[in-house]
From Swiss-Prot:
GO biological process: regulation of translational termination
PROSITE patterns hit by this protein: G_TR_1, G_TR_2
Domain tr-type G: 10-277
Main location: cytoplasm
Gene that encodes it: prfC
Record-stated family: Belongs to the TRAFAC class translation factor GTPase superfamily. Classic translation factor GTPase family. PrfC subfamily.
One Gene Ontology term of the molecular function aspect: translation release factor activity, codon nonspecific
Compartments, record wording: Cytoplasm
This protein's name: Peptide chain release factor 3
Keyword ATP-binding among record annotations: no
Function: Increases the formation of ribosomal termination complexes and stimulates activities of RF-1 and RF-2. It binds guanine nucleotides and has strong preference for UGA stop codons. It may interact directly with the ribosome. The stimulation of RF-1 and RF-2 is significantly reduced by GTP and GDP, but not by GMP.
Segments crossing the lipid bilayer: none
Length: 522
């Protein structure tokens, strides 16, 4: 790989933004896009009545509900770095999509609501990041409102998540009393709602302001200095190595809604965030600077442009250089393909991409060739990156087309939405009626909404009373083993499994059939 290409790869910063719903994830994404010069003004998820919606919330149902249910991909340049942001679903029902997205990034930004602290979804996603060793940067949001005390939030972060923290800045006041941020890293105080020439006040070697200022008369100023002194004496030492190893999280305070502390966060993040790193494969570790092009598909999205009914496969480039028109091998099938139609994104806006390098996320127009987890490369034809996680559904519905004359629309919609991986498809053993599985109720609502809006197919869904899926070997697939509490079905790959009513039904099945092994996904 040439030095120029190595430099280009090193400039890539590819990260996901994770949070519990309503922590302000989409708002901070908007502000980052603002600093990247991509948008002129930030939309707001809360501004539904005005008809303004967030740039990253592009799907119709997201605009209606004010939640992210798909992973948007956005790219911009900032301070010499190429930023690739993946805005992940904030709703817990879409954890599968989020987990797959976390396989495609080099770091994560965790957004926490200052009033609520660590919430269930945050904890879940954090654990996945830790499992993968992904560096985590923490942004404690909504400091313009009353919330938990900063020291309490730090203690919660360390106790609940089990990770060292290092506050890069520290709030002076909170809510209506918010006056500024004491920036430990840049050695300045960033004032809240100040004139531009007074926004940053330099600190002296003693930790106080170099020159006298009105902010020093505030009660909260002295309190902040005392807390900073406590952090200096008893807190963790700053360690870039531990940050990169995912063992220490730099913590930033701010307010995404009022755009306070966000640009400082972005500037610091670009300095620290890791460049594209290596990926595990069946042929060993593939380094980002390997000259051979390789990548994997972590997401498939249908109807990003409803007028064209198209489908896009999102690929994370792991090594080498992509050039439009290049020939690659889809290693799952061994098929040679020409990558002529490629695109990059700003939520639903897109432009043709002629060239990209390791760390970039690009979209490939898909006519049905790709599956989530596929590896493509112009190197070894047997290369396969590690498998992406798939989850066992916990809710199941039988699904029918209301209008039998529109079966074609129905089948196409089900097929495409299942290939996206947002919902799983099963079929009854003999009659092959459709059963869809999900990890949460919202997935069914989104599925029904998209079937109607994107495929002109009204559907009827009926619960089947089964909650647990367990796969069996083909030789154990005997319909006679089905009971009122268990049902033999097959998945989209025709693999047999039983759907059980509850744990009691599984135990009963195991007692009656001790030689049959039941297995689950994640």
């Amino acid at each position: 790989m040439s030095q120029d290409l190595q430099k280009e790869v090193a400039s890539r910063k590819t990260f996901a933004i994770i949070s519990h719903p309503d922590a302000g994830k989409t708002t901070i994404t908007e502000q980052l896009l603002l600093f990247g010069g991509v948008i002129r003004s930030a939309g707001t998820v809360k501004g539904k009545k005005s008809g303004k919606f967030a740039t990253s919330d592009w799907m119709e149902i997201e605009k209606q509900r004010g939640i992210s249910v798909t992973s948007s991909v956005m790219q911009f340049d900032y301070n010499g770095s190429r930023i690739n942001i993946l805005d992940t679903p904030g709703h817990s029902d879409f954890s599968e999509d989020t987990y797959r997205t976390l396989m495609a990034v080099d770091s994560a930004v965790m957004v926490i609501d200052a009033a609520k602290g660590i919430e269930a979804q945050t904890l879940k996603l954090f654990k996945v990041c830790r499992m993968r060793g992904i560096p985590i940067f923490t942004f404690i949001n909504k400091m313009d409102r009353q919330g938990k005390m900063p020291l309490e939030l730090l203690a919660e972060l360390e106790e609940v998540l089990g990770i060292e923290s290092y506050p890069m800045n520290w709030p002076i006041g909170m809510g209506k009393e918010l006056a500024g941020l004491y920036d430990r890293y840049h050695r300045v105080i960033e004032q809240y709602r100040s004139e531009e020439d007074e926004r940053f006040l330099p600190l002296g070697e003693d930790g106080d302001l170099k020159e006298a200022h009105a902010i020093q008369k505030l009660l909260y100023y002295d309190q902040a200095l005392e807390e900073i002194m406590l952090l200096d004496e008893a807190g963790n030492d700053f360690s870039r190595e531990r940050i990169i190893a995912g063992e220490q999280t730099p913590v930033f305070f701010g307010s995404a809604l009022t755009n306070f502390g966000v640009e400082t966060f972005l500037r610091t993040f670009v300095d620290f965030a890791p460049s594209p790193s290596s990926h595990e494969s069946n042929e060993g570790v593939i380094e980002a600077d390997n000259p051979k092009f390789s990548g994997f598909i972590f997401k498939i999205q249908a109807n990003m442009n409803p007028a064209h009914r198209d489908r896009i496969a999102f690929i994370r480039i792991c090594s080498g250089e992509f050039e439009r028109g290049m020939n690659v091998t889809l290693t799952r099938t061994g098929k040679s393909m020409k990558l002529a139609n490629s695109t990059q994104f700003m939520a639903d806006d897109r432009e043709t991409v002629n060239r990209a390098v390791a760390g970039d996320i690009i979209g490939l127009y898909d006519t049905g060739n790709y599956q989530i987890g596929d590896t493509i490369t112009n190197g070894s034809k047997k290369l396969e990156f590690e498998k992406l996680p798939q989850f066992t559904p916990e809710l199941f519905m039988r699904v029918y087309a209301k209008n039998v004359m529109k079966q074609k629309h129905f089948h196409k919609g089900v097929e495409q939405l299942v290939q996206e991986g947002a919902i799983q498809l099963f079929k009854t053993w003999r009659t092959e009626e459709y059963i869809i599985g999900a990890v949460g109720q919202l997935q069914f609502e989104v599925f029904e909404h998209r079937m109607r809006g994107e495929y002109n197919s009204e559907i009827r869904m009926e619960p089947i009373g089964k909650k647990i899926a367990r796969w069996v070997k083909e030789e154990d697939a005997d319909e006679k083993l089905s009971t009122a509490r268990s049902m033999l079905v097959k998945d989209r790959f025709d693999q047999p499994l039983f759907l059980f009513e509850n744990e009691f039904a599984i135990n009963w099945f195991n007692d009656k059939n001790p030689d049959i092994e039941l297995t689950s996904l994640l």
